[in-house]
């Protein structure tokens, strides 16, 4: 056999054989326990970068490992094919986005196959296929019928020069400019579709069935932002009610001014003539900013705002409070108005200091009085002061008392507020799922009949920016007849947010050729939820949250029985350039996986990506590291295939047997917890030991063969091609990937003997070898008889003898 492993020959050979023999074919009806593993599907942007490899190859390793453990594993792959990059490429290069996308899919699929992934490509889904997005449209209609889809006016980013809406990704820089023409981006109100994710807000806060990283559940919890408090009604001096939501109604007497969101509908009505110019200018500037910018807590960022020239009345103190507008108050949170309590809220305090507004203490801590000056905001609970009838109550008691008083006086009510907003799904783009709704002047909004789905995305559409949705400008597509009355009607010309495509694809994988339903329910009932999901943590509050919402909606429709889409989630880290910076073409630090595969082979690239460091942390690329993995696989190859010139040294078969059983346990435990780097480190040490043992008389024995077979089996999930070649070399005809994971004997994991340091008065004076099962008296006896220890204790009084099991012996003398 060749003395060196040639990946350019071996890897294509085995991939062809896997395909021919169908060893990865999905078998939904198998009696084996199921394991459904999914990695987030890629966008077909042109080619796989090293980040795709870093996300996908370890996921493939874990799936292979679970298969060898006896599970019926399903590990599918597909493409998130709709979206902005295809449309941008089409505009820039005068291309058909469909041809661009499907050409990329064909190329990327070849790359994924070269990775050696355990994928049944008959189960592939492509979200731009009409047979896929047909069911996006079907779900939309079901949501509409159930009240989960509705339409309302809302603001979108708008480029006045390009005359079009912009997606979030097209707004760049701190000044929020259009990426196409560099114009300042503004806002525009459009009538758009929403999914009512807020209907599931409380249920989405329940993570009890999820084995997910704490940072992800924390991000979702904060994003949903459930707050308990009260809605309180202030009135302007002109009599207009202004409702605020507060989590601290106990501080109502400390509200010394009010702040409205610049977009609040009362701003225009209440603004005085003297303040109108200043208010209008501030509103125009504020609405250009993102919510993130407006809610920044950066201490160095100056607080901005404008008094509108009007006052409201505090319903508790009856004091006049000035009404301001400021960009840190959002119409999308609460009521779009706040009562400002600068004494006990840091942002209100900074605002009051900036503009010279009154600050009043209404809560004290121990050793403070009602007159103690406020040097900074004090948000902590305490004892209420300067608050009329609730003086002396604790903050918690006062909170309840104020809510009861508000309800009795019809000035407010107990309320729960959420930061979460409903999901805006309308997009004024071309390359997406057409929204299946029809507008009839007689019948109103009517869904496309389900037997007419899919509503196909038309070809020959001019998607150059004009200020309208591209489908609206198609000469015929938008004109139709009402399915209810038969009269003239028009289609909705927006397309869906592409997060719709990725909210349920995990279910479609199970039956991608089903034509009568989005998926085959019997298969879904058996295989759901997903057992293992992998992908980036950047999807915490969009894709992952939207998927959970979609799942609960499907459950309530009777389509699935599971409460959650995936049980276990693992997030991989980010692979960096050699300079430890994020890879980018501008930095010149991008790693091309195709070149690496051509030079080293897919197995080497897979191995290094898992050896580079803890998978959940990521780390910088290191060319020296990949050379080390080349040497490791070469040594593994040689230890199995080469015959040593001499192997007559005396060896210890029992030691090799123990090492073999230990490495089985270690690699299995490590792969189960996605600790790929330590699994590979263990295999490297095992190969080094085998290189030594093969020069002894243990070489060629049953123990040796068991060790080399074990090495091959343990390598199989990590380096699937070379493992096949080694397995065949060892005389096996069936694929290594159809073999069982090797078992280990618990008794062989324990050392026959162990080495213990011996301390005298806390200082190490020697070491002893004892049986691993030795009891304390025999360990003490061995220590006292040791040739180094015995002279040191001779003639001394032994005060104490301490044995720390498996760690040390300490003898105290005087």
From Swiss-Prot:
Keywords per UniProt: Aminoacyl-tRNA synthetase, ATP-binding, Cytoplasm, Ligase, Nucleotide-binding, Protein biosynthesis
Database matches in Pfam families: Anticodon_1, tRNA-synt_1, tRNA-synt_1_2
Subcellular localization(s) per the UniProt record: Cytoplasm
Gene Ontology molecular function: aminoacyl-tRNA deacylase activity; ATP binding; leucine-tRNA ligase activity
Primary residence: cytoplasm
Segments carrying motif 'HIGH' region: 42-52
Catalytic activity: tRNA(Leu) + L-leucine + ATP = L-leucyl-tRNA(Leu) + AMP + diphosphate
Lineage: superkingdom: Bacteria
Keyword Cytoplasm: yes
GO biological process: leucyl-tRNA aminoacylation
SUPFAM superfamilies per UniProt: Anticodon-binding domain of a subclass of class I aminoacyl-tRNA synthetases, Nucleotidylyl transferase, ValRS/IleRS/LeuRS editing domain
E.C. no: 6.1.1.4
UniProt-annotated binding residues for ATP: 585
Residue ranges of the motif 'KMSKS' region: 582-586
GO cellular component assignments: cytosol
CDD domains per the UniProt record, alphabetical: Anticodon_Ia_Leu_BEm, LeuRS_core
Family note: Belongs to the class-I aminoacyl-tRNA synthetase family.
HAMAP family xref list: Leu_tRNA_synth_B
PANTHER family: LEUCINE--TRNA LIGASE, MITOCHONDRIAL, LEUCYL-TRNA SYNTHETASE
Protein's recorded name: Leucine--tRNA ligase
Species this chain originates from: Herpetosiphon aurantiacus (strain ATCC 23779 / DSM 785 / 114-95)
Upper classification of the organism: Bacteria, Bacillati, Chloroflexota, Chloroflexia, Herpetosiphonales
């Amino acid at each position: 056999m060749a003395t060196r492993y040639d990946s350019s020959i071996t890897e294509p050979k085995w991939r062809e054989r896997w395909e021919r023999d169908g060893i990865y074919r999905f078998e939904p009806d198998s009696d084996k326990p199921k394991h459904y593993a999914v990695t987030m599907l890629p966008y077909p942007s042109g080619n796989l970068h090293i980040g795709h490899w870093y996300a996908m190859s370890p996921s493939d390793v874990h799936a292979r490992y679970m298969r060898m453990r006896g599970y019926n594993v399903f590990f599918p792959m597909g493409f998130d094919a709709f979206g902005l990059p295809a449309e941008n490429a089409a505009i820039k290069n005068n291309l058909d986005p469909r041809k661009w996308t499907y050409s990329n899919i064909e190329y990327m699929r070849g790359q994924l196959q070269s990775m050696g992934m355990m994928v049944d490509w008959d189960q592939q889904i492509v979200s731009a296929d009409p047979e896929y997005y047909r069911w996006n449209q079907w779900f939309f209609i079901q949501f509409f019928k159930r009240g989960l889809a509705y339409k309302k006016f809302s603001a979108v980013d708008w480029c006045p020069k390009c005359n079009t809406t912009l997606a979030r990704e097209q707004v760049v820089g701190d000044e929020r400019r259009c990426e196409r023409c560099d114009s300042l981006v503004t806002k525009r109100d459009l009538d758009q579709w929403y999914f009512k994710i807020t209907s599931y807000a409380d249920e989405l806060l329940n993570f009890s069935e999820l084995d997910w990283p704490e940072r992800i559940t924390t991000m979702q919890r904060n994003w949903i932002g459930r707050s308990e408090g009260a809605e309180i009604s202030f009135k302007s001096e002109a009599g207009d009610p202004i409702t605020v939501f507060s989590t601290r109604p106990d501080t109502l007497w400390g509200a010394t001014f009010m702040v409205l969101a610049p977009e609040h509908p009362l701003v225009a009505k209440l603004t005085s003539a003297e303040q109108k110019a200043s208010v209008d200018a501030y509103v125009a500037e504020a609405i250009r900013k993102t919510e993130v910018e407006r809610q920044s807590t950066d201490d160095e960022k100056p607080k901005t705002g404008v008094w509108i020239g009007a006052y409201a009345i505090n319903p508790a103190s009856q004091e006049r409070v000035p009404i301001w507008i400021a960009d840190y108050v959002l119409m999308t949170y609460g009521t779009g108005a706040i009562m400002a309590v600068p004494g006990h809220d840091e942002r209100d305090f900074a605002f009051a200091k900036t503009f010279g507004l009154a600050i009043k203490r209404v809560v004290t801590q121990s050793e403070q009085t009602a007159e103690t000056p406020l040097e900074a905001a004090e948000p902590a609970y305490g004892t209420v002061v300067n608050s009329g009838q609730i003086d002396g109550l604790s903050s918690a008691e006062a909170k309840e008392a104020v809510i009861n008083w508000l309800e009795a006086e019809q000035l407010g009510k107990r309320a729960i507020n959420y930061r979460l907003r409903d999901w805006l799904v309308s997009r004024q783009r071309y390359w997406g799922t057409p929204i299946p709704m029809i507008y009839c002047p007689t019948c109103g909004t009517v869904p496309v009949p389900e037997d007419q789905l899919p509503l196909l995305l038309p070809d020959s559409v001019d998607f150059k920016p004009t200020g309208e949705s591209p489908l609206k400008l198609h000469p015929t597509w938008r004109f139709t007849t009402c399915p209810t009355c038969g009269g003239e009607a028009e289609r909705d010309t927006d397309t869906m947010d592409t997060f719709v495509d990725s909210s349920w694809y995990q279910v479609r994988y199970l039956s991608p050729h089903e034509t009568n339903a989005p998926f085959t329910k019997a298969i879904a009932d058996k295989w759901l939820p997903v057992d293992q999901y992998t992908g980036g943590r950047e999807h915490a509050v969009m894709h992952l949250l939207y998927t959970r919402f979609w799942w609960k909606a499907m459950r309530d429709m009777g389509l699935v029985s599971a409460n959650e889409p995936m049980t276990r989630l693992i997030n991989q880290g980010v692979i960096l350039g050699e300079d430890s910076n994020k890879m980018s073409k501008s930095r010149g630090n991008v790693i091309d996986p195709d070149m690496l595969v051509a030079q080293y082979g897919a197995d080497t690239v897979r191995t290094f990506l898992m050896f580079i460091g803890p998978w959940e942390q990521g780390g910088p690329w290191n060319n020296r590291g990949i050379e080390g993995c080349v040497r490791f696989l070469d040594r593994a190859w040689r230890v199995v295939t080469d015959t040593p010139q001499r192997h007559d040294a005396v060896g210890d078969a029992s030691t090799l047997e123990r090492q073999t059983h230990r490495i089985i346990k270690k690699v299995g435990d490590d792969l189960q917890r996605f600790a790929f780097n330590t699994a590979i480190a263990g295999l490297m040490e095992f190969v080094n030991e085998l290189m030594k043992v093969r020069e002894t008389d243990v070489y060629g024995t049953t123990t040796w063969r068991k060790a080399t077979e074990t090495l091959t089996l343990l390598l199989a999930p990590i380096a699937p091609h070379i493992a096949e070649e080694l397995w065949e070399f060892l005389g096996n005809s069936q694929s290594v990937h159809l073999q069982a994971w090797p078992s280990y004997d618990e008794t062989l994991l324990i050392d026959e003997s162990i080495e213990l340091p011996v301390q005298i008065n806390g200082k190490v004076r020697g070491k002893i070898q004892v049986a691993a099962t030795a009891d304390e008296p025999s360990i003490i006896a061995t220590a006292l008889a040791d040739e180094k220890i015995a002279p040191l204790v001779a003639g001394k009084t032994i005060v104490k003898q301490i044995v720390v099991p498996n760690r040390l012996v300490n003898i105290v003398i005087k």
